[in-house]
Amino acid sequence: MRFSWLEVAVTAASLANANVCIPLFPWYVSSPPFYPSPWANGQGEWAEAHQRAVEIVSQMTLTEKVNLTTGTGWMMEECVGQTGSVPRLGINWGLCGQDSPLGIRFSDLNSAFPAGINVAATWDKTLAYLRGKAMGEEFNDKGIDIQLGPAAGPLGKYPDGGRIWEGFSPDPALTGVLFAETIKGIQDAGVIATAKHYILNEQEQFRQVAEAQGYGYNITETLSSNVDDKTMHELYLWPFADAVRAGVGAIMCSYNQINNSYGCQNSQTLNKLLKAELGFQGFVMSDWSAHHSGVGAALAGLDMSMPGDISFDDGLSFWGANMTVGVLNGTIPAWRVDDMAVRIMTAYYKVGRDRLRVPPNFSSWTRDEYGYEHAAVSEGAWKKVNDFVNVQRDHAQLIREVGSASTVLLKNVGALPLTGKERKVGIFGEDAGSNPWGPNGCENRGCDNGTLAMAWGSGTAEFPYLVTPEQAIQSEVIKNGGNVFPVTHNGALTQMANIASQSSVSLVFVNADAGEGFISVDGNIGDRKNLTLWKNGEEVIKTVASHSNNTVVVIHSVGPILVDEWHDNPNITAILWAGLPGQESGNSIADVLYGRVNPSAKTPFTWGKTRESYGAPLVTKPNNGNGAPQDDFSEGVFIDYRYFDKRNETPVYEFGFGLSYTSFGYSHLRVQPLNGSTYVPATGTTGPAPAYGSIGSAADYLFPEGLKRITKFIYPWLNSTDLKASSADPNYGWEDSEYIPEAATDGSPQPILKAGGAPGGNPTLYHDLVKVSATITNTGNVAGYEVPQLYVSLGGPNEPRVVLRKFDRIHLAPGEQKVWTTTLTRRDLANWDVEAQDWVITKYPKRVYVGSSSRKLPLRAPLPRVQ
């Protein structure tokens, strides 16, 4: 049965069987139920924090626990999301969650870091960690408890997906390692990291009903990403396993449906995969307005509702007082709310929030010094809301380093590095210059004016400044006594031709933008319409190249673009991809162009000749009547380079490719089996669901006398001892059997899954089985970094040709040799067995490959048989 939207909006005991969907067409997949929601047990490094959480939650009343689980409403307090508080026990203000994965959104005096996709291009674990730690320091200094990042969803199934730049790479191993290092950095700075968007959030269009309807599409449910179990485990779940193993405190569930069940009430993905199989000990928070039911979401594994209201500023909540009603009437077991509160407080203690916490010293809603305490309704005290705390520290230096380390040299025919002696330097393209409205002149960066250093949406930050390529290069040229001629209007082709014909070197800057689906730029509804350059970029390149035989092209983009029609033009002597480098953009690219930094970046995605080279297109039209658009992941694990390999298609630039100002050689591959332990499937049962504290009567949870009620603020208290009246649910009184799934409220001991047993999954998955070493030699005349990459062939008839498993970034002086040594774990060599519901190393022969990209693998050897 489906409720009307209004009925759903006011119910506290809404349809709980969140995984039973009756699709319009019978062949559509549905997500199997998995209940009850596993309770945290403090495994591994979580033990101390878990015990402290249990101690404080045991002292909380029901409404205090509920207050931790529910945001107070959009724009009700300083942060984009803020829970209720528990002042009686020292939590004097609610937990503050704030965007984004690359810096602080809606703030000031903060840094704008390079995007996640740039971190992936560095292939550098240390830089990923340092960037995470620097961001965490800034969030902590602003009084933020929870950073809403990093992202591994979207992973990158679609090269034109709107938010792939927020994450890292379409390869799960590369993403997983850098995802985990970023999380460690953020949390070592004392801030809870949020791994998002869990899971299969691979496109923007149709992610939300109201958003789609605003664009003229009459759908009633959000898009469903339909995936098989093997693909889920081997591709999309892989980096989230790394995040859980790294100790991430929060995971954000996504807007989309997974196999026709909403991401924030999908018991298969939340209860089974995340909490039972991966042993996640932190809390699951909803994406903003991705919460679709009361009891259903609670039983399916959601722990925190953000921002608390159903629609922004409507004053209604699935949880809050409705959660209190649900516990009192027995539809939500008390142990489930206890577990929510324990999970939240465990993450809080694990990162040290109790030691480091200061109140938020900024307002997301105004840059003015003073404003109302509750901005959405202009109520509460008129007070100082912005302290203008500068949190940037010395992070500009790191930002510049990551920017240059992530610049991929795709082509170089003797053009680079520049000598500094070039007498006339032409700079071409709007992407070289400033946004005439200012670097933050477009709300949420929702435009493409000037140089592209950050894409658009909630995954953004406010620039403290933006060094453009024009500024940095002009300074360089003038310092060296040269002349510089910028033409930064893409329509000025005549002027470009004139300047190019006179220039010693012509530097062309072009871009391609994308972002979140609530903003449309030039008809790009978050996702890109195509993979071409924006603002006449191809014509700018062709114009300059036809008048200059030393044309260097620099691309700022959110992902791959089509370069096949111009990349091999002999007048184009160099091509660089600089991604989205953040505030130090110009300085970063100048460091590479002038040779202060030897480029070492490798492309974290494949550059195809056409959009069709990548496989299935985005779902851009409803394909299920007015119901949920269906996105079938029928390609399985074959995305990006795996898909190109399967089709034997030669890309323009393969995954992992990147040039240097020096050269490297690979030799002496050695493969040695280790005495790894035998794989032991997890067995046994959990303990029973623990309960902390006691539950009183409805009268104990009435709205406190004398407390001034703020309009639309989400409270945990009841308005009446009549639970039906307090819930305002027109369907109140249904029998539990009508809407509560079987076993959903069962708090008895539960079997431990074979693939589970510890955070990240079965601990024997991570045992080293094989040691691999290779010698890397700098055969050139310039010191530099090389990124050795290790790929494995898993051998099965339906497996990718190779899959990335290990990598590193190694510095070598001219002529220097180093032996790179790494290991392969059981997980690296295993496949997911759907029938056994476990990881299995198959009988098929396996091989290991080492080289500088997915297509340049000069070293190869068979792998020994291991189990």
UniProtKB/Swiss-Prot annotation:
Coarse class of the primary localization is: secreted
Q: Which Gene3D superfamilies match?
A: Glycoside hydrolase family 3 C-terminal domain (3.40.50.1700), Glycoside hydrolase, family 3, N-terminal domain (3.20.20.300), Immunoglobulins (2.60.40.10)
> What Pfam families does its record include?
Fn3-like, Glyco_hydro_3, Glyco_hydro_3_C
Picking any one GO molecular function of the record gives: beta-glucosidase activity
In terms of InterPro entries, this protein maps to: Cellulose_deg_GH3, Fn3-like, Glyco_hydro_3_AS, Glyco_hydro_3_C, Glyco_hydro_3_C_sf, Glyco_hydro_3_N, Glyco_hydro_3_N_sf, Glycoside_hydrolase_SF
SUPFAM superfamilies xref list: (Trans)glycosidases, Beta-D-glucan exohydrolase, C-terminal domain
Nucleus is among the record's keywords: no
A Gene Ontology biological process noted in the UniProt record is:
cellulose catabolic process
Record localization: Secreted
List the active-site residues: D287
Q: Which family does it belong to?
A: Belongs to the glycosyl hydrolase 3 family.
Q: What does this protein do?
A: Beta-glucosidases are one of a number of cellulolytic enzymes involved in the degradation of cellulosic biomass. Catalyzes the last step releasing glucose from the inhibitory cellobiose.
Recorded protein name is Probable beta-glucosidase A
Q: Which organism is it from?
A: Aspergillus clavatus (strain ATCC 1007 / CBS 513.65 / DSM 816 / NCTC 3887 / NRRL 1 / QM 1276 / 107)
